[in-house]
Amino acid sequence: MVKPRIIETDEGIQGEFDVQTYNSMMRSLRDRGWMETGHIIRSGIAHGLALEIGPGPGYLGLEWLKKTESTMLLAVEISPEMTKIAERNAREYGLEGRVKYVKGDAHQIPFDDNTFDGVFTNGSLHEWSQPIRVFDEVYRVLKPGAKCFISDMRRDMNPLVRRFMKLMVKPKEIRPGFISSMNASYTIDEIRSILNQSNLKESIVAKTFMGFEITGMKSE
């Protein structure tokens, strides 16, 4: 039986210790090749100007820039401390000229309608207090015909997978936050119901090993 969802903060990761610890975890995932970059590119987001929601320390978007040509990235992050880490990491990649991090909230994306050739985000959906509103914001800022890719954990993952993931999370100081995120994540049925109430209702939801991927497109 799947336990009820436990709501998590929508303020992102704040505080120097938590930010640095999360950066270490994401760098480790990057080094293991566990980024969702290939999935994003295969979904059709591989050119022009893209938006990343909740980039955290920035590795996903930076890997996307590294693996695509003549692309640019704008990223909206609610945590000022995390933005500083992402900017530092962009300099390490030598990609600071192709990415800009903006302090902002996904519930009110600070960009005009029909701006982006693609929108992607990983691991932030469970933090959104009003996911329907964010889905509608994603739809609004996409250009007609442009695509979005949204991935996250799911609360109804196999218990053995859940246990494995908890053990794999390092450094161990991040494990309580990881468990909190798992408990705040949605089931497949829940996320389909939410999408059906948004402008992204035509999106496809696919189950993955430990989560799900949403792929959608703004109508022409």
Task: Outline where the language-model segments fall.
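Class I SAM-dependent methyltransferase SAM/SAH-binding core
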Residues: L51, P57-Q108
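Conserved H-loop
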Residues: L95-E96, D112, K201
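A short acidic, Gly/Pro-enriched loop at the edge of an enzyme's catalytic core
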Residues: H107-G118
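A short SAM/SAH-binding and catalytic strip from SAM-dependent methyltransferases
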Residues: G118-Q130
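A short glycine-rich, Lys/Arg-flanked "PGG" loop and its adjoining helix->strand segment in the class I
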Residues: I132-P144
